[in-house]
From Swiss-Prot:
Protein family per UniProt: Belongs to the ABC transporter superfamily. Lipid exporter (TC 3.A.1.106) family.
Location (main, coarse): membrane
Its biological purpose: Involved in lipopolysaccharide (LPS) biosynthesis. Translocates lipid A-core from the inner to the outer leaflet of the inner membrane. Transmembrane domains (TMD) form a pore in the inner membrane and the ATP-binding domain (NBD) is responsible for energy generation.
Enzyme Commission identifier(s): 7.5.2.6
Membrane topology classification: Multi-pass membrane protein
Designated name of the protein: ATP-dependent lipid A-core flippase
PROSITE patterns according to UniProt: ABC_TM1F, ABC_TRANSPORTER_1, ABC_TRANSPORTER_2, MSBA
Quaternary structure, from the entry: Homodimer.
Compartmental location: Cell inner membrane
Reactions it catalyzes: ATP + H2O + lipid A-core oligosaccharideSide 1 = ADP + phosphate + lipid A-core oligosaccharideSide 2
Parts of the chain that traverse the membrane: 24-44, 65-85, 140-160, 161-181, 252-272, 274-294
Length: 582
């Protein structure tokens, strides 16, 4: 138990620096709570002269003064309750936003191995739900005490049972409160819908980044994703504050109206018609105290600790995620341009948890401006080779060089700046076609450059037929486009990037023959004067490659040109015969 308490204390201490920048909100809330407590104390104290002197002996003018004071005190209580609730909600919203942004940035720089081992849904839960729980632990518990401490509606029954004459005042006040609640409820529905939409935007933004993590890494899109997420997270925070403001302001309004019921009870108690009904001091005290008690329910206090512990548990989970190492980026080498020679030297690599290596002592060279194709059965290690070039994974043994420099000596951003990737699984963002193509470049590009890239990729053929052309929003992951169209946008993106090293990872394997022919010319344009690594499923697409490597079980079994490999009458010839005899 002591260990648990210590862990909770340590977790909160670590969380405090996140809360500290917003401590003015906490101070304002605390001051408001002090005045709120003083108002409550004054209300209770006002019962003393009534009980001390006896109900029938109190000067009527004193009761009339007390009626005015009650209204003022309840007004103060309502205002301070609103200030306290709003300030705490402001702090809570800020803490949530900071935690979400920190998690989002951290996830964008995590290695691919991390995403291999963690589901997208779980990560979304960390960002969206767990961060909310952290806010509940830091300030939400106090919000619960303030807000939930304002009501015990059950005391209304006690009031009517004790003195229905005095409690009858509520029949006048009740309809007014009902109207307010109806108006506020309608507003809540509207605000709630807006908040749900914001939650959808937030989840969509995170999901796009997570699903397209390789694209973000390969094209250096972290800044774009960060700005996009900053915007949607702030929109959600502001809409959340509107919901909280509406909730917080409705409480004091109802309380202020209820205070008129208190004043009315005091005035009615001075009337002879009421005085002659044998209204005892005890009955009066019960009715009056019950009205006060409606503003101070305590039943939710027992849940505060549980709420705090849930928040701390979520906080520990998030800190554990933030403590995970991001991609290793220890390289210092930065160059503006490279020639593009890629060399594998005795490279061995194994995936985590796998018994056998995915690559075993691989060595080959892709000279500047040449094309090397990798062929082999599924799972032979072809895609692993491509992933190693961009350092989505790091080699265990051996090394990979770019222009004679170990790729681990380059900074990650600089290495990936020199590489363009077109893969089988094209990831497009829920944005315009123009922005999807321009995603490849870190600096701003002109409309003409985008059009030029689209034309070179033979994408303008279908883009011009769309109603909004380049400004067409294509839906999540390009849902409104065909496979061939999506692939041509990926090629246009790579053309615009204009990197000297090009990786084509089974770029046509998922397309039908007609679509494949449509983009083959685009691929040939893309490969011109570039160092190209092609992972091919269809051998017809790599017959012109300068060298073809046949990969089996992580090793190079054969190498040579198309004609040379056919002449060997080995594994390549068998693959070729299998495809072309069907």
């Amino acid at each position: 138990m002591q260990d648990k308490d210590l862990s909770t204390l340590q977790t909160f201490k670590r969380l405090w620096p996140t809360i500290a920048p917003f401590k003015l909100g906490l101070i304002a809330s605390a001051v408001a709570l002090v005045f709120n407590a003083l108002a409550d104390a004054a209300l209770i104290q006002m019962l003393k002269p009534v009980l001390d002197e006896g109900f029938g002996k109190v000067d009527n003018s004193l009761l009339r003064i007390m009626a005015i004071v009650v209204v003022l005190l309840i007004f103060v209580r309502g205002v301070t309750n609103f200030i306290s609730t709003y300030c705490l909600a402001w702090v809570s919203g800020k803490v949530v936003m900071v935690m979400r942004r920190r998690l989002f940035r951290h996830l964008m720089y995590m290695p691919v191995t991390f995403f291999d081992q963690n589901s997208v849904g779980r990560l979304l839960s960390r960002i969206v739900y767990d961060s909310e729980q952290v806010a509940n632990s830091s300030s939400g518990s106090l919000v619960t005490i303030v807000r939930e401490g304002a009501y015990i509606i059950a005391l209304l029954t006690v009031m009517f049972y004790t003195s229905w004459q005095l409690a009858l005042v509520l029949f006048i006040i009740g309809p007014i409160i009902a109207v307010i609640i109806r108006i506020v409820s309608k507003k809540f529905r509207e605000l709630g819908k807006n908040l749900q939409n914001s939650m959808g935007d937030l989840t969509s933004s995170v999901e796009q980044m997570l699903k397209g993590h390789k694209v973000v890494l390969a094209f250096g899109g972290q800044k774009i994703e960060e700005e996009r997420f900053d915007q949607v997270s702030n929109n959600m925070r502001r809409r959340g504050m509107k919901v909280m403001a509406a909730s917080a302001i409705s409480d004091p309004v109802v309380q202020i109206i209820a205070s008129f019921a208190l004043a009315a009870v005091l005035f009615l108690a001075t009337l002879p018609e009421i005085m002659t009904q044998n209204l005892s001091a005890g009955s009066f005290t019960v009715v009056f105290s019950s009205m006060l008690a409606m503003m101070r329910p305590l039943k939710s206090l027992t849940n505060v600790n549980a709420q705090f512990q849930r928040g701390m548990a979520a906080c520990q989970t998030l800190f554990a995620l933030l403590d995970l190492e991001t991609e290793k980026d220890t390289g210092k080498h930065v160059v503006d341009t490279v020639k593009g020679e890629v060399r594998f030297e005795n490279v061995t690599f194994s995936y985590s948890g796998k018994e056998h290596p995915a690559l075993n002592n691989i060595s080959f060279t892709i000279p500047q401006g040449k094309t090397v194709a990798l062929v082999g059965r599924s799972g032979s290690g072809k895609s692993t080779i491509a992933n190693l070039v961009t350092r989505f994974y790091d080699v265990e043994q051996g090394k990979i060089t770019l222009d004679g420099v170990n790729i681990q000596d380059y900074t990650l951003a600089n290495l990936r700046e020199h590489c363009a990737v077109v893969s089988q699984q094209v990831h497009l963002f829920n944005d315009t076609i123009a922005n999807n193509i321009a995603y490849a470049v870190t600096e701003k590009c002109t409309r003409e450059q985008i059009i030029e890239a689209a034309e070179a990729a033979y994408a303008m053929e279908f883009i011009e037929k769309l109603e909004n052309g380049l400004d067409t929003v294509i839906g999540e992951n390009g849902a409104s486009l065909s496979g061939g169209q999506r692939q041509r946008l990926a090629i246009a993106r790579a053309l615009l990037r204009d990197s000297p090293v090009l990786i084509l990872d089974e770029a046509t394997s998922a397309l039908d023959t007609e679509s494949e022919r449509a983009i083959q010319a685009a691929l040939e344009t893309l490969q011109k004067d570039r160092t190209v690594l092609v992972i091919a499923h269809r051998l017809s697409t790599i017959e012109k490659a300068d060298e073809i490597l046949v990969i089996e079980q992580g090793e190079i079994k054969e190498r040579g040109s198309h004609q040379e490999l056919l002449a060997l009458n080995g594994a390549y010839k068998q693959l070729h015969s299998t495809q072309f005899n069907h």
